[in-house]
């Protein structure tokens, strides 16, 4: 069920397109938790953040079925722009890659399958934009592993879909509330 704000945004912005609709439909058909999909409104926001920031190197933690990574890649304005994305569930890889192929962004995204904590230790950075939408219990640990890889003032939206108001999630995400404001930084609620 959409909120009034989501209905307004959808009514006043461009459609998500056939490839993203395909990813959304396949997510609903082929996964147990389709509500984890970023969706059209958040996807449009991510595309816009990428375009406005001019980000060239993007990191996404939590790929799920590839919808948000596709949106980030679609927003790249530089021909050499790239998205690195991390997903722990290897069973989603075929769906992810098929969706990116349909969206025409496969060559702009590197999918890394495995534990984000281990992968983040190896990724050199820097990243102009980081989107975190993975295991909420590990947000503060992700933050500690990426903070030195983000230039000062780089945007870092943290995805809090689901129930961010739950104390356990809210407490673990409090590290983001203490980040000094910078251009494009969107703190969690």
Where are these regions (language model features)?
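A short alpha-helical cap/connector motif
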Residues: 1-131, 136-157, 162-189
């Amino acid at each position: 069920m959409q909120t009034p704000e989501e209905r307004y945004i959808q009514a006043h912005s461009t459609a998500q397109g056939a490839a993203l609709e395909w990813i959304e439909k396949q997510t609903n058909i082929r996964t147990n938790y389709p509500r984890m999909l970023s969706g059209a409104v958040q996807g449009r926001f991510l595309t816009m953040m990428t375009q406005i920031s001019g980000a060239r190197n993007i990191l996404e933690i939590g790929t799920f079925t590839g919808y948000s990574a596709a949106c980030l890649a679609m927003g790249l304005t530089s021909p050499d722009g790239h998205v690195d994305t991390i997903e722990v569930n290897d069973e989603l890889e075929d769906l992810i890659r098929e969706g990116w192929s349909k969206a025409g962004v496969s060559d702009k995204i590197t999918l890394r399958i495995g534990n984000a904590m281990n992968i983040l230790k190896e990724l050199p950075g820097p990243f102009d934009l980081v989107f975190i939408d993975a295991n909420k219990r590990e947000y503060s640990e992700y933050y500690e592993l990426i903070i030195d890889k983000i230039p000062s003032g780089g945007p870092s939206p943290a995805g809090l879909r689901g129930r961010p108001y739950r104390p356990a999630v809210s407490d673990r995400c409090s590290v983001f509330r203490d980040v000094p404001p910078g251009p494009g930084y969107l703190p969690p609620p």
